[in-house]
From Swiss-Prot:
CDD domains: AspRS_core (cd00777), EcAspRS_like_N (cd04317). L-aspartate binds at residues 175, 221, 449, 490. Residues 199-202 are annotated as: Aspartate. The gene is aspS. InterPro entries: Aa-tRNA-synt_II (IPR004364), aa-tRNA-synth_II (IPR006195), aa-tRNA-synth_II/BPL/LPL (IPR045864), Asp-tRNA-ligase_1 (IPR004524), Asp-tRNA-ligase_1_N (IPR047089), Asp/Asn-tRNA-synth_IIb (IPR002312), AspRS_core (IPR047090), GAD-like_sf (IPR004115). This is Aspartate--tRNA ligase. It is found in: Cytoplasm. Belongs to the class-II aminoacyl-tRNA synthetase family. Type 1 subfamily. Its EC number is 6.1.1.12. Its main location: cytoplasm.
Length: 590
């Protein structure tokens, strides 16, 4: 029989109607003579009743049924008695009187409860992912992902973009994370790489006159994983010709507005706020600040420059800084022991200590209060807008450590003090990034974004004299403290690209060998162009209110980049290795 309704969509208006439903058994209850079955499909649950008064055959089948059996149920929709109405489900006012129950397939007892409140460990859920996906919250997340992707496609189609696929087997490049390599059977000893992004190909599409490109692109990076990282991930990849930075930012904002409207039914304010990279680091201690709450960092270096507290004075004298955050009204909540724990937390980010003061009436009290003159205390009170009951936390060190420690502490306190509105979506642009970052250990510069980012025009001469001072025409989109994506205007002239390669330590031969095809393409009339790439997995995570990226992906990898379901990666046969002209050499400790 053909299905007539999905389980969660049988309406009250169907009372009296004969229906056919198909799905899985969520729960079976035998009440002595009557058997109740909660039948579930991807839309929800409906209650099925097997009664000897209606069908002895259906009752006999229901007696055999167990959790997760697959059924086809034929019966009549009836209204529930008022006292049995279930307001927690969409079909709670009706039930199905079963006239025929067909067991399509049986099921072993699942290793965990197929429900949103399951207590199964994540590794068990990942091993039996096909069961985990039956949980309503997992299906809803995948459905949201589909809706977001469809909205993006519809929006970009309306803006005259073409969706174009770029190669998955490409060339390994030395910048960025480690590549996943694929050996070539046809070319012994040579390798393809899986793309870390379609960056070069989308730029070549601009050279090719496409002008407006996008792709829901699969990308691969062999890097250490965190809760919001995966070895294979999906990005919304966009490139445009003949544009300026404001054009891409405007397009992205309009696209995000459409996505949020489709996903959550709300309108988000535009334009998004914008701050520079330097301002983000100064005010929030982060290049991806969560602006849903205040608790900003305040520089008090000049106030304490000549103080008797040598930890502060010495830090300023040696070129560092002293910054503080004011946790309003938090002094009574944090004991000395609690503050010591905050100090240990700050120590994980390089801070050598966490100094503190509490505001009690008109006085500042704490272990370091005695070191400050009345004038210095008054200046601190003004700078930090101190009121009775405030807790002041200080870090003194080099700028990078101060930013890292206080930035992390700010987020921790924001959560502990309930300052974050979890329902809010706070988009933010971070602009004016440095083009290059210097690695002290390796003694060379790295691209802050990638080697194809256009420098600010006036800064191009500095590539050869003072690379650290060069600004990038780059921009990151941040949402609730997560980097949602980044973009830039691109280099489109060969001489500028060659200067960039030299600043990154490439010899002329290395640049030609790795990127000769791109440099040559720039000699054939390349238009000015730029773009952005937004993390789809992360966007879904944030809009779904999840905290783990793995919950937004149908078949994700673990933190060790393995698949517990298929047991990938795994060994291959000697014959396969021989065909690829490869031999496995394991590390000695293995």
């Amino acid at each position: 029989m053909e299905r007539t309704y999905y389980c969660g969509e049988v309406p009250e208006t169907a009372v009296g109607e004969r229906v056919v439903l198909k799905g899985w058994v969520q729960k079976r209850r035998d009440l002595g003579g009557l058997i109740f079955i909660d039948l579930r499909d991807r839309t929800g649950i409906v209650q099925v009743v097997a009664s000897p008064d209606v069908s002895a055959e259906a009752l006999a089948a229901a007696e055999r049924v167990r959790s997760e059996y697959v059924l086809s149920v034929e019966g009549t929709v009836v209204a529930r008695a008022p006292e049995t109405v279930n307001p927690n489900i969409a079909t709670g006012s009706i039930e199905i009187q079963a006239e025929r129950i067909e067991i399509i397939n049986e099921a072993k007892t699942p290793p965990f409860s197929i429900s949103d409140d399951t207590d199964a460990a994540e590794d068990v859920r990942l091993k039996y992912r096909y069961l985990d996906l039956r949980r309503p919250v997992m299906f809803q997340t995948l459905a949201l992902r589909h809706k977001i992707t469809k909205t993006v496609r519809d929006f970009l189609d309306s803006e005259r973009f073409l969706e174009i696929e770029t190669p998955m087997l490409t060339k390994s490049t030395p910048e960025g994370a480690r590549d996943y390599l694929v050996p070539s059977r046809v070319h012994p000893g040579e390798f393809y790489a899986l793309p870390q992004s379609p960056q070069i190909f989308k730029q070549l599409l601009m050279v090719g006159g496409v002008e407006r490109y996008y792709q829901i692109a699969r990308c691969f990076r062999d890097e250490d994983l965190r809760a919001d990282r995966q070895p294979e991930f999906t990005q919304i990849d966009i490139e445009m010709s003949f544009i300026e930075q404001k054009d891409i930012m405007d397009l992205t904002e309009r696209m995000m507005a459409a996505v949020v409207k489709a996903a959550k039914g709300i309108d988000i304010p535009r334009p998004f706020p914008r701050i520079t990279y330097d301002e983000a680091m100064s005010r929030y201690g982060s290049d991806k600040p969560d602006i849903r709450f205040g608790l900003e960092l305040v520089d008090v270096s000049e106030i304490v420059r000549n103080s008797a507290f040598q930890v502060f004075a010495r830090a300023v004298k040696e070129g560092g800084q002293v910054k503080a955050i004011n946790a309003k009204g938090a002094a009574p909540r944090y004991s000395r022991k609690d503050i010591d724990a905050l100090g240990e937390f700050a120590g994980r980010y390089g801070a050598k200590g966490l100094a503190w003061l509490k505001a009690e009436g008109e006085e500042l009290k704490g272990p370091i209060a005695k070191f400050f003159t009345d004038e210095e205390q008054a200046a601190l009170r003004r700078a930090l807008a101190v009121e009775d009951g405030d807790l002041l936390l200080f870090v003194a060190d080099e700028k990078a450590i101060v930013a890292a420690a206080l930035g992390a502490l700010r987020l921790k306190l924001g959560k502990e003090l309930g300052l974050i509105d979890e329902a809010k979506l706070a988009f933010l642009w971070v602009t004016d990034w440095p083009l290059l970052e210097y690695d002290e250990e390796e003694g060379r510069y790295y691209a802050a974004h990638h080697p194809f980012t256009m420098p600010v025009r006036d800064d191009i001469p500095l590539l050869e004299t003072n690379p650290s001072a060069v600004r990038a025409q780059a921009y990151d989109l941040v949402l609730n403290g997560y980097e949602l994506g980044g973009g830039s205007l691109r280099i489109f002239e060969r001489d500028v690209q060659e200067k960039m390669f030299r600043a990154l330590g490439f010899s002329e031969e290395e640049a030609r060998r790795q990127f000769g095809f791109l440099l040559e393409a720039f000699e054939y009339g390349t238009p000015p162009h730029g773009g952005i790439a937004l993390g789809l997995d992360r966007l879904v995570m944030l809009l779904a209110g999840r905290t783990n990226l793995r919950d937004t992906i149908a078949f994700p990898k673990t933190a060790s980049a393995s698949c517990l379901l298929t047991e990938a990666p795994g060994p291959v046969s000697d014959k396969q290795l021989e065909e690829l002209h490869l031999a496995v050499v394991l590390p000695e400790n293995e």
